Structures are given as C-alpha cells and as structure tokens.
C-alpha cells in the first residue's frame, strides 16, 4: 500500500521490478481529493500523488485506490469521484476504486453526519453512476452510503462523538499547523458547525 509520496525515480524503480511479474497490483490510500485529502493525510502532496499515480498507470501497472470513507471524505467526495472517473476513462480497468466505510475512530466516522451530509452522499452516488465505474464499485459505495444512513449516531452518543470530533480538529490544527476551516470551508457552514 502506498501514498505515492516517493520520488519519480523510486516509482520508476518499482515499475522496473514489477513490470514482468504477473498479477501485480499496487494499492494506494486516499480519502478525498485536493486540499481535503492533504488535510486528512498530513504531508500528502496531491499533485505529487496524482503524478505518481499516472506514471504507474501509464506504464500498465494496475492500481487499486482505497478510500476509507469517513466524515472528512464527505465534503469533497464529488471531486474525488470525478478525478477517479477521469483516470478510469484514460486508463480503463487498470484503476479500481474501493470505498469502504470507516468504523473507528468513532469521532471521525461518517456516523456523526447530519441530513445535509447524507444529501451530499446520495448526490455523489448519483454522479458516480454517470461515470465509467464498474457495477461492483458503485454497489460498494452504495453499501457504504446505506450503512452510514442506517447507523448514524443519535442522542448522547452523537453529541459525544461530535464534541470529540471538534476536539480532534482543534488539536490537529494546533499540532500540525493546519487550518480546518481553510481545508473544509463548506463543512464548517453546514450541519453541526454551531457546536464548535
């Protein structure tokens, strides 16, 4: 599994090592796209990630993208889906996408979402159906959205995990010099922003 932070020469070295090995596939983890992905996976440079991803795909190396779908994935999921569709259009079945839901930590799980977040997820699922994803990829995302809708936290449990989420965000920004509201400008404007 890779986050594609390695240099171009190391990507080429990897390609040279595996190009003749049958059934080789590289898995890369990313949970959103753009500045949101960079916030979630601190240290990620999305342009570098994309360049390395394209380098591998262009040389015929199959890549599986693993998006561990969490609360922070929701805000920019449409851009992630569009980018994956763009790459799938260019490279076909060399690129696969899997979007299982995150269960823990609970305060980052999409189970803390509200109705506006559910709407974003449902709309993004409709968008995904318009692009060249496989039936299996769409159904896995449909399952993720369905599971989140059926398992949203309620009552005291919801309040606790949302408070823990905001405590996490504040500590993340303090320790890493990041800015949640810059990375997620819309997330702070919908849902439970008033709880901050």
Feature locations, PLM:
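Core AdoMet radical
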Residues: 1-10, 17-50, 62-71, 94-108
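Short secondary-structure boundary/capping segments
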Residues: 13-14, 42-45, 79-84, 113
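Short, well-ordered alpha-helical packing segments
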Residues: 15, 50-54, 81
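A structural motif corresponding to the C-terminal end of an alpha-helix
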Residues: 20-21, 52-63, 87, 91, ...
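Active-site rim elements
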Residues: 37-41, 66-68, 107-111, 129, ...
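Flexible glycine/acidic-rich beta-alpha junction loops that bind and position SAM and/or redox cofactors
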Residues: 69-75, 91-125, 138-146
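Catalytic cores of alpha/beta
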Residues: 71-87
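Radical SAM enzyme core and accessory elements
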Residues: 127-196
